[in-house]
Design a protein with these regions (language model features):
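Short secondary-structure boundary motifs at beta->alpha junctions and helix caps
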Residues: 81-91, 160-198
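Generic short beta-strand segments
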Residues: 63, 132-136, 171-173
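Sec-dependent bacterial lipoprotein signal peptides
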Residues: 1-22
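Sec-exported extracytoplasmic/periplasmic mature domains
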Residues: 105, 109-113, 200-208
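Surface-exposed short loop/turn segments
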Residues: 25-47, 53, 110-161, 177
Length: 209
């Protein structure tokens, strides 16, 4: 009787272990993370005839952002922008605050607005640019997706007492070519490039007066 009970328990344990191993084998592997860069093309200094903004340094500080826009996960929202979520496995290569700082530095260097554009501290004359990310979203809507970028800029003169020269907000929305995240990253890059061009154009106009 004891032998039969032992054999039954052993058979039950073997069946249970087989079921556990079978279920483990059927589990889907965890999704891997995918990383995205911004791709922004700046005009070269030779493409434009502009008056330099300053003969001194322009410092671009790290952008400000709040909540989800400080994190690396790509943000998406509904059409009304009331519900904001994150693509947990689709990430920017760096935080949006730092990415936009570096992209704006490269953009301004290419346009020739100053002899030196940097993120370094400036103690002399020149300008400081402060940016804020208001929106940088993939927007889900009926029939497709679009992107919306909202950025605010302040241009501050560092000659003598710091003085605000310009404060302006910009927004750009556009429809994406598809629902893949690589297409969203491309569309966000194009929207940011458009906003950078608007900001630079507004400052050019300010100094051309």
């Amino acid at each position: 009787m004891k032998l039969n009970l032992f054999a039954s328990l052993r058979l039950f344990a073997i069946i249970l272990m087989s079921l556990v191993l079978s279920s483990c084998g059927a589990m889907k592997p965890l999704p891997s993370d995918t990383f995205y860069r911004l791709r922004i093309t700046a005009p070269t200094a030779g493409d434009t005839s502009r008056t330099p903004w300053t003969e001194h340094l322009i410092r671009v500080v790290k952008f400000r952002a709040s909540g989800v826009h400080r994190e690396r996960a790509i943000v998406y929202s509904d059409d009304a922008s009331l519900v904001v979520q994150q693509h947990r496995h689709h990430l920017w290569v760096d935080s949006p605050e730092r990415m936009l700082q570096q992209e704006l530095i490269q953009y301004l260097r290419s346009t020739g607005v100053a002899p030196l554009v940097s993120s370094s501290e400036s103690r002399g004359d020149g300008f400081e640019i402060r940016g804020e990310i208001r929106q940088m979203d993939q927007v889900m809507q009926d029939g497709g997706t679009r992107v919306t970028v909202g950025l605010a800029f302040e241009l501050v003169s560092l000659s003598g007492q710091p003085r605000l020269i310009l404060a302006r907000e910009y927004q750009k929305s556009s429809v994406t070519n598809g629902k893949e995240l690589i297409e969203t990253a491309d569309a966000l890059s194009a929207a940011i490039e458009f906003v950078f061009a608007q900001f630079v154009g507004d400052v050019d106009e300010l100094f051309d007066k």
